[in-house]
Amino acid sequence: MTASTDLRFLVVDDFSTMRRIVRGLLKEIGCNNVDEAEDGAVALHMLKGGRFDFVVSDINMPNMTGFDLLKAIKADDQLRHLPVLMVTAEARKEDIVLAAQSGAAGYIVKPFTKATLEEKVTKIMQKLAATA
C-alpha cells in the first residue's frame, strides 16, 4: 500500500495496547507516519493543532466517545474532509448504522487482522482519490 506512506494517521483508543497494535499494523501495511491519542478529546485537540490525513478511532472511550469525536470532526470546516475509520469490540447493527449516518468512512470490529485493516484503509483511500 504505497499510496499511504506519506499520509499522517491518528489512532485513537483508550487502551494503550490497542493503540500500539493498530499503529504496528498500519506500519506493516506501509503507513509510517502514525500518532496516538488516548481519547476523543485529546484527538480533537491534536487534529486542530496539526495536519492529519486519516483517523482510526475506537468507539467506547471516556471523556469523548468515538461517535462524539466523529461528530466534532464532521462539524468542523477544517476537519470534515478527514476519513474516520471506526473500530469497536461490539458489532451492534445500530452502531454500524450510526457510524455510517454520522459520516464514518468505514467500520471494523475487534479483533481484526492486518488484511482487514489494509483492505478498509485501501478502499477508503481509493474512494477519496476518486472524488478528489
Locations of regions flagged by a protein language model:
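Two-component/phosphorelay signaling modules centered on CheY-like receiver
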Residues: S16-D35
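Acidic, metal-coordinating helix/loop segments flanking the phosphotransfer/catalytic sites
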Residues: E36-F54
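Active-site T/S-Asp motif of two-component receiver
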Residues: V56-D58
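Receiver (REC) domain active-site loop signature in two-component systems and cognate sites
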Residues: M61
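C-terminal output helix
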Residues: F112-V121
